[in-house]
Amino acid sequence: MYHIDCRDQLERVFLRLGHAETDEQLQNIISKFLPPVLLKLSSTQEGVRKKVMELLVHLNKRIKSRPKIQLPVETLLVQYQDPAAVSFVTNFTIIYVKMGYPRLPVEKQCELAPTLLTAMEGKPQPQQDSLMHLLIPTLFHMKYPAESSKSASPFNLAEKPKTVQLLLDFMLDVLLMPYGYVLNESQSRQNSSSSSQGSSSNSGGGSGIPQPPPGMSFYAAKRVIGDNPWTPEQLEQCKLGIVKFIEAEQVPELEAVLHLVIASSDTRHSVATAADLELKSKQSLIDWNNPAIINKMYKVYLGDIPLKTKEGAVLKPELKRDPVSTRVKLKIVPHLLRSRQAAETFPANIQVVYDGLFGTNTNSKLRTLSLQFVHHICLTCPEIKIKPLGPMLLNGLTKLINEYKEDPKLLSMAYSAVGKLSSRMPHLFTKDIALVQQLFEALCKEEPETRLAIQEALSMMVGAYSTLEGAQRTLMEALVASYLIKPEVQVRQVAVKFASTVFPSDHIPSRYLLLLAAGDPREEVHGEAQRVLRCLPGRNKKESASKQMPSFPEMVYYIQEKASHRMKTPVKYMTGTTVLPFNPAAFGEIVLYLRMCLAHSAGVVPTSQSLADMQDHAPAIGRYIRALMSSSQATASSSNKSGETNPVQIYTGLLQQLLAGVGGLPVMYCLLEAVSVYPEKLATKFVDKTEWIKSLMSSSKEEMRELAALFYSVVVSTVSGIELKSMIEQLIKATKDNHSPEVQHGSLLALGFTVGRYLAKKRVRMAEQHDLETDADLLPEQEEIIRSATETIGSFLDSTSPLLAIAACTALGEIGRNGPLPIPSEGSGFTKLHLVESLLNRIPSSKETNKMKERAIQTLGYFPVGDGVFPHQKLLLQGLMDSVEAKQIELQFTIGEAITSAAIGTNSVAARDAWLVTEEEYIPPAGAKVNDVVPWVLDVILNKHIISPNPHVRQAACIWLLSLVRKLSTHREVKSHLKEIQSAFVSVLSENDELSQDVASKGLGLVYELGNEQDQQELVSTLVETLMTGKRVKHEVSGETVVFQGGGLGKTPDGQGLSTYKELCSLASDLSQPDLVYKFMNLANHHAMWNSRKGAAFGFNVIATRAGEQLAPFLPQLVPRLYRYQFDPNLGIRQAMTSIWNALVTDKSMVDKYLKEILQDLIKNLTSNMWRVRESSCLALNDLLRGRPLDDVIDKLPEMWETLFRVQDDIKESVRKAAELALKTLSKVCVKMCDPAKGAAGQRTIAVLLPCLLDKGMMSPVTEVRALSINTLVKISKSAGAMLKPHAPKLIPALLESLSVLEPQVLNYLSLRATEQEKDVMDSARLSAAKSSPMMETINMCLQYLDVSVLGELVPRLCELIRSGVGLGTKGGCASVIVSLTTQCPQDLTPYSGKLMSALLSGLTDRNSVIQKSCAFAMGHLVRTSRDSSTEKLLQKLNGWYMEKDEPVYKTSCALTIHAIGRYSPDVLKNHAKEVLPLAFLGMHEIADEEKSEKEECNMWTEVWQENVPGSFGGIRLYLQELITITQKALQSQSWKMKAQGAIAMASISKQTSSLVPPYLGMILSALMQGLAGRTWAGKEELLKAIACVVTACSTELEKSVPNQPTTNEILQAVLKECCKENLKYKIVAISCAADVLKATKEDRFQEFSDIVIPLIKKNSLESMGVRTTKAEDENEKERELQLESLLGAFESLGKAWPRNPDTQRCYRQELCKLMCERLRLSTWKVQLGVLQSMNAFFQGLMLLEEEHADPEALAEILLETCKSITYSLENKTYSSVRTEALSVVELLLKKLEEAKQWESLTAECRGLLIESLATMETDNRPELQEKASVLKKTLESLE
């Protein structure tokens, strides 16, 4: 039975379909019946299903041909989602959804888009694909909320992770789809059927499957194309829609990164740009190290690599994805370069590299990016993960280098990558020397731009080969050697790098290669080689333990072997007649290196920097050479060299060879040194080469001549007898050769050195008492020649050539040093006295050079050394001490040395042979005569010179005294005068110049060391007393006294010079160890003098080292003080203390060890009463805080902050700046410490810091302190994150207060003085600035972490701030915080919403409109989280305010609040619509004052009303009861304005509802009429207007008699009463209202009405024609306007009130007509217009013009009167509006006359007048008037 019914129903539907003729009918039937018809498919009856199918087939044909027909998609979607529906139904339903959805208007599609997503859940894959295919094009048109929040999101995807994934996958395929792609499936089907036997897979991805687009599988392409493929333009829109969808954050950012990357590579500009911009904006938010993002990128890049799945099944061919196109790859790789994770992901990383370098579709851009990726892997991939990659990367790079030669830049990158790989994985390269060779070869052959990269790569690879052994090392030697001789400079440079780094520093063959390179012509090659060769071995034991230089014999033999080999080959070097094995530069370097090896083997630190330093090591080298010479067998045994060729002899041979060929000072020195240290064996070899030596003595270089002369003297000293005599004679002769000054100079020196050596030997012989008799016969002759030689030398002292004079002086000094001068003591001629005086006179002479003076002083000092009975010793010493000159410091050190030597005489160390004995080893000969005058010298210095009034003398004396103490430390005289010497030094400590002070301090240190224990105690106490009390030596002032030295002016004369020593002394006293002051003085070595040759001779560095060791136990007390002193503003103290620090604190961890102590000291001294200490403490603190873990001193942080805040306000600027510096550093450190990674330490730091920064920092009166505190808080909030949560209740209110406190006060001042409008703009800008301030930024950071645990404490403080907070920023900020809280933690906030509401209420009535708006805005959000009861109370409060309070501020706050609720919490408003919307309705009728903001308020109320009602009419119907109640209340208000507002609202109700029904009509009218009673008040007009509106709208309802509803009569009575009021303005409205009521009710009250109106018209006419009153012009103007208005109103009202009553008309028609006609002739155009309109109404209702009331005579009279006056208007040329209105009156008359057939009443006179006037209008400038006039004229003419 049921299925018969079904079939009947289906038949009926069929029938209806058949009858549907229009599209509209068809659409209606489909909308109604399609869903139920589809449901019938679930029928079990075959017949029913069959019938349905027939119906659907018919339907499909009809629908497909009519694209405009809409389908009931919404209903179908609901049906599709029905879980109970059978699949048969859903399968058909989706067909119609697919057909209907694209036909919908775009807005409707957007509305249904979320439903499509919901419908997808749990459906089969093809249907899901179809739905997504429908959805994607819609995304382009979707509108998303500006602020993304889950509640406002159109797609609520958060709960649908599976749907999101499906959608994202589909979107990815859409983005990958190229434009214009066609899937040729028909061909593929044939293929698949033909090749179904073979299952081999081909490049197409499977048998017979067409090639999908790059990055897609066949299936993906097919589903994107779908049933209706998109055109390229549609596809572009789809892609843009997807990008918009992602932009709107509809899906998690993480999931959509890949989509944006792919979209950014799109071929269409619009898509690529949109995606690019979005990617850039999210760049900082995306975590590129997220494995999910990176794996997706790799998967898309590489496609599905054919790997078998775990089960062993291969991926279906149609599902296999191809790799993406090169264009997409070029976009993916730059993002991989950002990611550390990408570099670690194996094997994808290597697959991408190989694809980019060698893939089939790669290009140079992709290759470049792939190489960058290789660099990225080398830099960031961790050790464990790079291991398996290394060999593959290296293979790839070498393959690229070998095969790809087109792009030099690319090659450069490849080479560079090889270098980087070698530094990461050296073991890969160590065994592969061939690779080095390959790169060296490439360096020879490649383009110049590539060479730099190869050079860099090779330099990086060096480290990989430093462990080579055996054959590998030999191979590398050969390789380096072969490339060292290549023509390309870069090749040689790299070869040097290899030679120096790959081999150890004692590896002879590589050193030899470097020596050859040192002779390279290019600076970059030889410079590097020299740097390596001259790098000195370490001084400490640990370093020296490893053999760092080759042994001297081995190196010599190797060089000799190479030299002899080279002499036989073309590489030898020719210079003039000489042939050398090496070029001069290389040879020079070789001999210097051999000298370094010699020194190293001799056990001293090798140096090749200065000859003087080298000479200091000569005795040690001498011992080694002697040992080497004596054990020649041992050296020969290591190789098969003949025993005669001793290494030393080979060495001297090489030196001689180079010296003969090229020369050179260092070479000369090396030869001289070798011979001098062992003359017995080595000098004898050169006796036959004296001529060659002489040639060297006449060299053009002075130093060369000096060294050659020394060499000559050593050689000559080995001969004796006649040979010696002849050699000396030759020299004497040569000195007289005036043609060559060089020869003279060399001979003079040689003569001096030779005589000196002769005397020294003689002295030794005499001492040893050897056979004097045997030599006696030769002696007299020799003595004679010696004397002769001395006199010859003496004769040159007065030479005009300074060169020869200096040489003579030097020669005499050498003779005097070695023995008594062989000349008379006194008398005439060249005597010792003459010599002394001559030399002494030269010292102060201005003619002499400094060099001459130096030599003269040295020579004078030597005379008593060689001569134990030198007669003029004291004269000489006195002369030296008297020769003081200003600014001759170096000279004073020389004098000091000379005085020391001369004072001790023969016991002086100057008497030794410097080549054989060091100063320390020298012991004076036992038999020498003693000529020690030290007591006398000491006495003269202490009692005369040191207390001289001349500061230069004092300084010189101090230097001499230091020299005496240093050199004669063991002398009993010095030891017995320690106190006097100390006093002398102390007196100099207070000198104004630094050098004197420094010399004195060094002297004091030495004196202390020399005393015994008792001496030391006395010395300490004296020194401390002198320093601390500042007692000074009084200097007598004579006429010659120099008061200020040059540069002394401007220095404090109050002993400021002592400040450094006072500090040192107080430092020692604080340690209870006053004697430490000496140690400090020794360490405080800060004068440059001590670095000079003369200063270094004192050896203070050794003393300092010892002092450092002695001070070590006091480090705990010293370190804090010294640390601070290093930053002292006084340069002297700073340098001294830094010197002490560097000497004592050698271990860098010392500061960390004593961190607490240092910190304590610094904090204490930050507030010292001395500015110097405060400043140094700040600077020290700044330095201390940097880069140190401060976890142990967290408790000290507040103290540091607070103290530095105080110092920031210091009286001294430099201290303030130092404090600022320290604070900035402290801020940075604290921010780092507040990182969540620090755990508990971070939490502790925040806990101690916040109170300090909030209470002390932000509230500080110092601007800089406040700024820094805020800055620090902002940074802490960024880094601390969730750790801020417990502190939020304190932090947030404090920051909110600061928003106002920190605002410039001038803004408040300006705001108070501004106009209302300016104030609003300005305050808005202020609040906006506050909201974007760092404080607000910090607050917003904190808000993220708030929850119920914190709110309890925070809310009361927040409420307090809102109520009592001062300042715009604070109050606005509070409101902003509340808004944030409602979004961050809505549920947690609910219990506190009531409190916050009541607090915000106080803000709503704030005088400042900006605060008011902020609070309203906050309230709008807050109601969302509050309880209903709280919201109701709020709304009642607002209602009360609005109705009862007159102040505008309350009205405004109500409007703002309700508007905010409507906008931000619409659901809340809907729930309370009955309370809110009536108020809104009333509010929107507020009478707006243009000047005030009421217009804005009206708009807000209107918006609230319109947004929340279903159309205004519907809204009024819905809330009619409430609306009437509130308007009644308004009418009963005491406020006139509110009454008027209520009236307007009532009028609006009646207008919009068109007809009110009882009891509402009665209620409204009663209320209005009640309001009418009484006197006139401003706005009362509105009541009248409302009455008119109500009566007009509800006239039919008023006819019925209803209890409690005023009758028409009562209403008219009340209104007419109001028309009698005196107030003209009000009267006009009342008359208009009465007229409207009369017109609506059709009542006849014309008699009463005309009695009111006609006098008004007549009065007006009289006044307007009468004389003007004497009132002011503008008042007159206003009055005239009002009268005009009343006149117009009166005429209009008469027209409206003209009744349909024949009796009344009979009474008044004549009078009224006459009145109008009169006014028509006399009035202005405005009045004419009004009269004409009234006339129109008059004739419209004139019953005379109707047949049944005809009275031809009366009518004729009226018409004549009318025609006479209307001609004026018809002929009014100026105003077309007047002509138009007049024409319409004439037209009406003619029409009425025609209808009533009363033409006879229109007399000929009338017709004539009218025709005449109409004729003038035929030329009217307005065509429509012209035409109408013409028609009317013809009508009239036809009557005649």
Curated annotation (Swiss-Prot):
One annotated Gene Ontology cellular component of this protein: nucleoplasm
Modification Phosphoserine occurs at: 825
Entry keywords, A to Z: Cytoplasm, Cytoplasmic vesicle, Cytoskeleton, Endoplasmic reticulum, Endosome, Isopeptide bond, Nucleus, Phosphoprotein, Proteasome, Repeat, Ubl conjugation
Pfam families: ARM_ECM29, ARM_ECM29_C, ECM29_N, HEAT_ECM29
One of the GO biological process terms: proteasome assembly
Single Gene Ontology MF annotation: proteasome binding
Compartments reported by the entry: Endoplasmic reticulum; Endoplasmic reticulum-Golgi intermediate compartment; Endosome; Cytoplasm, Cytoskeleton, Microtubule organizing center, Centrosome
Tissue note: Widely expressed (at protein level).
Keyword Cytoplasm part of the UniProt annotation: yes
Tree of life domain: Eukaryota
Keyword flag Nucleus: yes
Cross-link Glycyl lysine isopeptide (Lys-Gly) (interchain with G-Cter in SUMO1), sequence positions: 1034
Region (Disordered): 187-212
Low complexity: compositionally biased ranges: 187-202
Knockout or disruption consequences: Deficient mice are viable, fertile, and do not show any histological abnormalities. Under stressed condition, 26S proteasome dissociates in wild-type cells, but not in cells from deficient mice.
InterPro entries: ARM-like (IPR011989), ARM-type_fold (IPR016024), ARM_ECM29 (IPR055444), Ecm29_N (IPR024372), HEAT_ECM29 (IPR055443)
Swiss-Prot/TrEMBL HEAT repeat ranges: 28-65, 107-144, 162-206, 327-363, 388-427, 430-467, 470-508, 684-721, 722-760, 784-821, 830-869, 871-908, 932-970, 976-1013, 1014-1051, 1113-1150, 1153-1190, 1195-1232, 1244-1282, 1286-1324, 1349-1387, 1391-1428, 1518-1555, 1559-1596, 1606-1643, 1647-1684, 1780-1823
Phosphothreonine found at: 831
Stated role: Adapter/scaffolding protein that binds to the 26S proteasome, motor proteins and other compartment specific proteins. May couple the proteasome to different compartments including endosome, endoplasmic reticulum and centrosome. May play a role in ERAD and other enhanced proteolysis. Promotes proteasome dissociation under oxidative stress.
Family under the similarity heading: Belongs to the ECM29 family.
Oligomeric and partner information: Non-stoichiometric component of the proteasome; associates with the 26S proteasome. Interacts (via N-terminus) with VPS11, VPS26A, VPS36, RAB11FIP4 and RABEP1. Interacts (via C-terminus) with DCTN1, DCTN2, KIF5B, MYH7, MYH10, MYO10 and ARF6.
Name of the protein described by the UniProt record: Proteasome adapter and scaffold protein ECM29
Source species: Mus musculus (Mouse)
Underlying gene: Ecpas
